[in-house]
Amino acid sequence: MSTKNPSVFKPSRGVAYQLAKFFTRKGEERSAFYLVWHVVLRDRKLKLKLYPQLAYSGVMLCVFFFTSLKKDKPFQENLDELVLEGGGNFYLFFAYFANLSLSTAISLMPYCDDFKAAWVYYALPVNKPGEVIVGGLKALIFKIYTPFFLIISSIILSVWGLKALDDLILVYINSIIISMLTAKWDKNHLPFSEEHTVQQGGGNFGMVMLMMVIVFFIGGSHYILATYTPWLVPITIPLIATALFFLVKDYKDMSWQNFETIDV
């Protein structure tokens, strides 16, 4: 992946092009964004692993929603009770549930059918491998997580109203932080640098469990904040966004010493 010619993975002027233009820097980061965006679309084994799990997440969310309804009450009365449940902030559970889609995508990002092409990371002048990871994560966030989150957010806003908007913004920023912390604490793997068949289910399960623990901690803190001091939520948003900025910067500054050797 050459820094001198980042247009290698440059698509036509569609959605990916516009997102990369506004949210990535030229060079390794933007090239990785294009690469991950297109491999997610084209890699057959990756899609067979990713999309069924995304569908499962959606089904489980529907199951949780409908099992919370009482059969002996009208649907509208059930909705009214649901709005009041958990101090009126029960929607945070559904909002943070969308993290399952992101955790699944991140756990699969290192694997690809053409993993032997990973030697290019070392052969070409990739000076900041951390930017490759950041570009890949941004592609997954916009390609996988954001559409799922927008669907859930539209449902939440239709039921709970605009009072949930500040919380949803905070959930989105927190979710990006959660994904970056999980990827950083897990072993660093460059995008599509390993074979599908050597993927260890236990390692992926551990990564998903780690993300769930972080989600529980951050989501629980958010719930307490929204329940007892809701006026602090809009104040917290710029503070958390600033923390995300420095986290991304720290990730981009990672050197090759932070990465495992690619065995090709």
Question: Model regions: which residues?
Answer:
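Hydrophobic alpha-helical transmembrane segments of membrane proteins
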Residues: 1-121, 128-264
